[in-house]
Design a protein with these regions (language model features):
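Active-site HxH/HxHxD metal-binding segment of metal-dependent hydrolases
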Residues: 6, 11-101, 123, 133
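Metallo-beta-lactamase
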Residues: 6-8, 13-15, 74-86, 101-192
């Protein structure tokens, strides 16, 4: 039987049923490289088991929180705190994997250590959660950063990738238009936040119903985190102020002119 050499990107969660399926899918393959886009629990934990089975090295930007603008304790629940790559890669590095070249494209925002992998031979970008096929990424502070996310989206517009293969959703065959729509969506959301501040709505829990009309109340927490990411960016840029540390319970006020 002929075994192919393959690289596995984001092997997934450390779940027994998932690991069994992963092992079955790879039974006729020779895994030479394990590439990790970012350290969330649905992406990186299975890398440890896959490495044990195959002996392949793991590649990633670094441990969870690597690349964050500000230090401090990691508080988000979805981080894989145990991941540490065998090979730490940086923006522009090229991985020769099973005869093909993967260019590492650092795209912080969804997480500070997020990396996309560009398959040069096919002008294809494995975009992880930076660009997903069905919605914009959730940006959860402190490891998620809205300013970094927007800069990383604009960075992709300078590239010539023809197709994106996201971790969630189908292939994206009009990547530049797709990314431009994500940028426009986030700028619209930012404008809504500034409008709320202008109207005297100063607390995130009071902003959510107006900015997300009709949203299931069970999702208010996630929506609030997204607004917090926008507000942290506005505070850093001097377009808003917070009474004390900017967090979900802070009082925010608008200063200066709105960015439109």
């Amino acid at each position: 039987m002929l075994f192919r050499s393959v690289a596995v990107i984001d092997p997934g969660p450390d779940d027994p049923e998932h690991l069994e399926g992963l092992r079955a899918a790879l039974r006729n393959e020779t895994v030479t490289h394990i590439l990790v886009t970012h350290t969330h629990r649905d992406h990186s934990p299975a890398a440890r088991a896959l490495k044990e089975w195959t002996g392949a090295k793991t590649y990633g930007f670094g441990p969870h929180g690597k690349g964050r603008i500000e230090g401090g304790i990691v508080v988000e629940e979805g981080g894989d705190m145990d991941f540490l790559p065998d090979v730490a890669v940086r923006d522009g590095d090229v991985i020769d994997a099973a005869g093909v070249n993967f260019e590492c494209v650092h795209t912080p925002g969804h997480t500070s250590s997020h990396i996309c992998f560009a398959l040069r031979e096919e002008k294809a970008l494995f975009s992880g959660d930076h660009v997903m096929g069905w919605s914009t990424s959730v940006i959860v502070p402190p490891d998620g950063d809205m300013a970094q996310y927007m800069a990383s989206l604009r960075k992709l517009l300078t590239r010539d990738d023809a197709v994106y293969w996201p971790a969630h959703g189908g292939p994206i065959r009009d990547p530049k238009d797709f990314v431009a729509s994500f940028i426009a969506h986030r700028l619209d959301r930012e404008a809504q936040v500034l409008a709320a501040l202008r109207d005297g709505v100063t607390r995130i829990p009071d902003m959510v119903p107006g900015i997300y009309p009709g949203l299931d109340k069970r999702l208010y927490g996630a929506a609030g985190l997204s607004l917090l990411a926008h507000l942290i960016q506005l505070v850093r840029e001097g377009r808003a102020i917070a009474d004390g540390e900017p967090n979900l319970h802070a009082i925010f006020r608008k200063i200066g002119r709105a960015h439109v």
